[in-house]
């Protein structure tokens, strides 16, 4: 059961880390589609904005200004949160790989491997926090912006939708939470499992068996007085 939980957590961790990295460095966090004309589709990301022509499929992208330039608060905070989530998730995944039983790293000390799994789980849990905050905050801001335009009857032909990059960020964050929960639960459920826990019992058992057999085979020698007493009692 321990190995199954570790492999399940590793599977979730690798995909969650990949989702977070792809979400951070792609350009489809918000889709701006003109349904009235259906000429082009505009995708806005954290680093650049791309427009795709609906007829010929030509895609042109414009990078944002330098990171030192003034940007909206939503963009700056989401960048910082997603980069933090990427770094933490990557560190947690590498730590988890070192803690797996199938990886030949410190094979003679299973307790260190258990601790590595716990550290990896804690790191993944922490990584999911900035990831989900950044993704949900961006999505809520997109929804609020769209609702405000509809409320004020402005640019009704333009629709703002969540792009697949935003969904990947949410999925990666939830995967980090689930992988971290599996690893931390795995540590507490199986913390007493290990060869060193059974070592004293294994040593005591043959020793006690040998002691019993030696006690049975040992016979105390009879003295002359004991022999004479035995003869007298027989008579």
From Swiss-Prot:
User: Hey, which stretches end up on the Extracellular side?
Assistant: 25-79, 137-169
Mainly localized where? other
One Pfam match, given by its short name, reads: PMP22_Claudin
Task: Give the reactions, separated by semicolons, that this protein catalyses.
Answer: Mg(2+)(in) = Mg(2+)(out); Ca(2+)(in) = Ca(2+)(out); Na(+)(in) = Na(+)(out); K(+)(in) = K(+)(out)
Q: Which UniProt keywords apply?
A: Cell junction, Cell membrane, Ion transport, Magnesium, Membrane, Tight junction, Transmembrane, Transmembrane helix, Transport
Q: Where are the transmembrane segments?
A: 4-24, 80-100, 116-136, 170-190
Enumerate the Gene3D superfamilies for this protein: 1.20.140.150
Tissue expression profile of the protein:
Expressed in the corticomedullary axis of the TAL, specifically in the cortex and the outer stripe of outer medulla (OSOM) zone (at protein level).
- Per UniProt, the short sequence motif Interaction with TJP1 occupies residue numbers 233-235
Chain ranges on the Cytoplasmic side, renumbered to this chain? 1-3, 101-115, 191-235
GO MF annotations for this entry? identical protein binding; paracellular tight junction channel activity; PDZ domain binding; structural molecule activity
Q: In the UniProt record, does the keyword RNA-binding occur? A: no
Per the record, what about its domains?
Answer: The first extracellular loop contains negatively charged amino acids that affect cation selectivity.
Describe the subunit structure. Can form heteropolymeric tight junction strands with other claudins. Interacts with CLDN19. Cannot form tight junction strands on its own. Interacts (via PDZ-binding motif TRV) with TJP1 (via PDZ domain).
Q: What protein does this entry describe? A: Claudin-16
Look up and give the organism this protein is from.
Mus musculus (Mouse)
């Amino acid at each position: 059961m321990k190995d199954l939980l570790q492999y399940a957590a590793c599977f979730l961790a690798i995909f969650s880390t990949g989702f977070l990295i792809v979400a951070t460095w792609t350009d489809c966090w918000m889709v701006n589609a003109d349904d009235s004309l259906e000429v082009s589709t505009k995708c806005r990301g954290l680093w650049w904005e791309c427009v795709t022509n609906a007829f010929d499929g030509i895609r042109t992208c414009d990078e944002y200004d330098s990171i030192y330039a003034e940007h909206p608060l939503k963009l700056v905070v989401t960048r910082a949160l997603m980069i933090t989530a990427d770094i933490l998730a990557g560190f947690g995944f590498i730590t988890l790989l070192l803690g797996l039983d199938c990886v030949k790293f410190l094979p003679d000390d299973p307790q260190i491997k258990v601790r590595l799994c716990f550290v990896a789980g804690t790191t993944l849990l922490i990584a999911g926090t900035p990831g989900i905050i950044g993704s949900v905050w961006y999505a809520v801001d997109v929804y609020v912006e769209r609702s405000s335009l509809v409320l004020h009857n402005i640019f009704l032909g333009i629709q703002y939708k969540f792009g697949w990059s935003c969904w990947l960020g949410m999925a990666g964050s939830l995967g980090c939470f689930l992988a971290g929960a599996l690893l931390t639960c795995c540590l507490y459920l199986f913390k007493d499992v290990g060869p060193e826990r059974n070592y004293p019992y294994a040593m005591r058992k043959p020793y006690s068996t040998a002691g019993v057999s030696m006690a049975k085979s040992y016979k105390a020698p009879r003295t002359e007085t004991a022999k004479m007493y035995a003869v007298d009692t027989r008579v």
